[in-house]
Amino acid sequence: MPRVFGHYVPARLLTLAAGEAAIVFGSVFLGLALPLVGFHVIRPAWGDGFAPSMVLTTLVLSMAHIAALYDTRQDYGRAELLLRLTIAFVAAYLVIAMLGYFILHLTLARKAFLLSFVTAFPASFLLRLVHGRLTAQSRARRKVLLLGSGEVSQMIAATVRASRHTYEVVGRLDANGRGGDGSDGVWSLGTLEDLDWVSKVTRPDVIVVALEERRGTLPVSEIVESKLQGTEIEDWPNFYEKLTGKIPVGNLRPSWLVFADGFKPARITVLTKRTIDLLVSLCVVVLSSPVMLLIAAAVRLDSPGPVFFRQDRLGRFGRVFRMLKFRSMRADADTSPPPPDAPDPRVTRVGRLLRRTRLDELPQLFNVILGDMSLVGPRPEWVALVPEFKAKVPLYLHRLAVKPGITGWAQVKNQYGATVGNTWDKLEYDLYYIKNMSIFLDMLILLHTVQIVLFTKGSGEWKQKQAPSTTSASYAG
């Protein structure tokens, strides 16, 4: 699976996105050229089409992502594919039309604009039909041979079965040849010393080293020979990261964290990220200020108490800051016990609407402007919960290496909550983000977030409560 700025992206998605980008980009210049056929007019300045074609291509790919057209878990029929693609293209072309009204360099002639749409849209639809058929025909599962039979090996086998990636485990080898009876779906094929002939028989595409004890047992010569024959050799943490988008905290050797790539973003990445945070936050605050004033008035009229909810959260390097949200619960919610699974009576009428639309998060833009938070990063933890998590979750404080965010990798991967179990899972996603932090990954997370807000009702990642009375309750996160 190839990596884009450190983030794993399936090859079939890269080819689809590249093809779609080429179609949209080329359609703009086709739209500029076609009006010239049969006419004695001055040839257009082709350089003038570069900026709008680049922006339009970015918009189409972004809207397609928001419409879940790059979601490998989905298998749309032709009717739904056509509907989603129509929404994505219409939205993208409307945005470029509005941008062209304000920015001269993004303006397209009306005929070029229409010709671009009527050529790019059907071509993209046809591309997706052909691409879907070709990938379905060539989606042979890649064979994986596991070295090891312990907990780590079993976890990798379970992860492969649960994933939608094109892998299948053909068997495992261990030190004594007693790697299992197939009860977990994986049979033992012999000992580690049998790697040479087992590889010739099973012809694995990938050998995953999942040995919990390697000293004196790792068949180095046979592994090198397999690598020379073209077989991929993967250490199990890297393979797990590739499949899940997580760093496996529980079984990880400390040395892996020390020597693994990543965990140190380039200075230009940090500066660019901060610049984007400031520009986007300032623009959104200005544009949404009328909405925020209306929300503030509605909160005050709906229930007595302050407009904003403030809570101490842990920021980068453990610095405490006050996080802002629009208040969505009664002002006395701090002292009332959390309800059972029934709807929380402490949430106000306006609060329910704010939570459903995530508008209660808007004031956190001020935290971003002040430098306490970023648009993207691990969610800031409530200070009162940190001691418990620090004691029970390994490597927990490593998530403080970057600024917390309004949204994050864990949230778009459907992980939210304040129990130790949820926090453990969130940490694995957070560490993946910290290891592979890039502007590309930030943009991907923001697009995922927009998709969730627009198309997912009651998503668990932002179901929040503002003030628990016990550390195991969920909270305003």
Question: What feature does the model see in each segment?
Answer:
Residues 268-333, 367, 444-477:
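A hydrophobic, helix-centered structural microdomain
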Residues 49, 85-89, 275-286, 357:
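Loop-to-transmembrane-helix entry motif
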Residues 1-139, 474-477:
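Signature of alpha-helical transmembrane segments in polytopic membrane proteins
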Residues 348, 370, 393-477:
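C-terminal terminal-structure detector
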Residues 85-89, 140-159, 306-329, 349:
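Membrane-cytosol interface motif
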Residues 167, 177-181, 240-253, 307-349, ...:
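Short, glycine-rich, amphipathic interfacial segments at transmembrane boundaries or analogous
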Residues 1-23, 27, 75-77, 126-289, ...:
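N-terminal hydrophobic signal-anchor/signal peptide
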Residues 342-403, 445-453:
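A short, structured surface patch at a secondary-structure boundary
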